């Protein structure tokens, strides 16, 4: 289990009523990721999704379908199929040090079996307490909560809200 630093980390836990492979597929298939990665009604576009350690994770978003603006430019640090993804935006997809806005972070997504489907856990780590506080104030729980709900609905066989 990951050690949580409450001064610097934000967490979100859900049970998704779908098997782990369905949740994993929604994370690792570009056409599926685009359906839930940003809160509706914003639209996501997956520009690069190289699901391997060191692989690029690049997305854009649009409020009205055009133009798209950069959203995520990060790299995968850890990929354990059907169990764990870790990515950071502190290094961009070209492996250059980055100063992402609004905050630099490392996100760990963990999928475990649960009697009702998948135990889904997000841990987002920040460099210091101020960055954590800023991310929370900007709506971490609302934003990540909304996309997790959309992910769950997709993995459970529904459609995006």
Features from the language model and the residues they span:
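Hydrophobic ligand-binding cavity/cleft-lining segments
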Residues: 1-44
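A generic structural micro-feature
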Residues: 4-6, 51, 66-70, 99-103, ...
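Intrinsic-disorder/low-complexity, polar/charged segments enriched in Ser/Thr/Lys/Arg/Asp/Glu/Gln
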Residues: 7-13, 20, 44, 56, ...
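Structural motif
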Residues: 17, 79-81, 114
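Hydrophobic pocket/interface hotspot
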Residues: 23, 33, 57, 76, ...
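Glycine-rich portal/gate segments that line the openings of hydrophobic small-molecule binding cavities
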Residues: 45-91
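Short, highly charged C-terminal tails/helix-capping segments
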Residues: 46, 154-161
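Beta-strand/loop substructures that line and gate deep hydrophobic ligand-binding cavities in soluble
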Residues: 88, 95-142
């Amino acid at each position: 289990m990951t050690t949580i630093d409450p001064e610097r980390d934000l967490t979100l836990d859900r049970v998704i009523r779908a098997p782990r492979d369905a949740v994993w597929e929604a994370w690792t298939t570009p056409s599926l990721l685009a359906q839930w990665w940003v809160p509706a009604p914003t639209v996501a576009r997956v520009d690069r999704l190289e699901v391997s350690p060191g692989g690029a994770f690049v997305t854009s978003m649009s409020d009205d379908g055009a133009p798209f603006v950069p959203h995520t430019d990060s790299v995968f640090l850890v990929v354990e199929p059907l169990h764990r993804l870790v990515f950071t935006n502190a290094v961009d997809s070209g492996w250059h040090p980055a100063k992402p806005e609004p905050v630099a972070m490392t996100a760990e997504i963990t999928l475990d079996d649960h009697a009702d489907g998948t135990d889904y856990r997000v841990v987002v780590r920040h460099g210091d307490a101020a960055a954590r506080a800023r991310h929370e104030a900007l709506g971490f729980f609302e934003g990540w909560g909304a996309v997790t709900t959309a992910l769950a609905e997709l993995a459970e066989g529904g459609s995006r809200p």
